[in-house]
Design a protein with these regions (language model features):
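Rhodanese-like catalytic fold shared by cysteine-dependent sulfurtransferases
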Residues: 1-9, 13-136, 140-273, 279-284
Length: 284
């Protein structure tokens, strides 16, 4: 099923801690304790084929059966179990993975290996800052994470806003831009996105993000709440120009409102996910 184009949901019903120790790469963690809240958003179409998976513990304590009952009560009908759970998956010779957000992290590593995304370690970045070099640090995490901890002097530019805000902030082509996150993945994706967009400045990903900065013994700030200005018309025009070039280069498709409405009214084909990439304030 995984190797076909047929849509189905592979749902791991264990708690995230158990899931993180060992799971199938393409499985989504929807623990029984949060199933009623998470499933309607994750799998909006109720006739979607759903495969539930757990481990021996799950079977022993009827977690799978209870999860199936919960899903039936929510309106889902096409539900089955992976026979033997993750143990049978492993015994058949297939890999199991540890951690969370494993698939997206693997994608980040693939991007870095494919594009040779430039990177800089914490010590080298600190040296550049101390030498007062022309450098800006963009923290690509959401505002809530940025407020928790951040690198001194970093600007909070969430990943989806990097190009949107770039030309308003970076006015000198000699400025070096470093993109950071908490670890690696969002730094890599953010930096490579700017590079692919053709911005004129040198761009690098901060290796291991705020975690690497902390492990190197450098100070982290808390409760930073600086709000960046809305980009000017000229900055927006430059960002839009880069966006269109990227869309053309990679064949990004565009749909009009009528097509979107058609998809929203289609309840029998596939699940539709409509993602608003603006800030929570703009969304509200």
């Amino acid at each position: 099923m995984i190797l076909t184009d047929n849509e189905f949901a592979l749902i791991d019903v264990r708690e995230q801690g158990e899931f993180a120790t060992s799971h199938i790469l393409t499985a989504c963690c929807v623990p029984l304790s949060a199933m009623e809240i998470l499933m309607p958003e994750m799998v909006p179409r109720q006739d979607t084929t759903i495969v539930l998976v757990g481990d021996c513990f799950s079977s022993r304590y009827n977690l799978l059966q209870r999860a199936a009952t919960c899903l039936h009560e929510l309106g889902y009908q096409d539900i089955s179990f992976l026979e033997g759970g993750i143990e049978s998956w492993h015994d058949t010779g297939y890999l199991l993975f540890s951690g969370i957000n494993t698939l997206s992290k693997a994608f980040g590593e693939f991007v870095e290996a494919t594009y040779k995304t430039p990177r800089i370690d914490a010590a080298s970045l600190k040296e550049k800052i101390d030498l007062d070099e022309k450098i800006l640090v963009f923290d690509a995490r959401p505002a809530e994470e940025f407020r928790r901890i951040s690198i001194p002097g970093a600007l909070n530019v969430p990943g989806a806003e990097l190009l949107y805000r770039f030309f308003e902030i970076v006015r000198d082509p000699d400025i070096q831009v470093v993109v950071n996150c908490a670890g690696r993945t969002r730094s890599i994706i953010g930096a490579q996105s700017l590079i692919n967009a053709g911005v004129p400045n040198p761009v690098m990903a901060l290796e291991n993000g705020t975690m690497g900065w902390h492990l190197a013994g450098f100070e982290l700030y808390c409760n930073q709440t600086d709000v960046l200005p809305v980009p000017s018309e000229a900055s927006m025009s430059a960002a839009i120009h880069c966006t269109r070039k990227v869309a053309k280069r990679y064949g990004v498709k565009v749909v009009d409102r009528n097509k979107l409405l058609e998809w929203q009214n289609d309840t029998i084909s596939k699940n539709l996910y409509l993602l608003d990439v603006r800030s929570p304030e703009e969304f509200i």
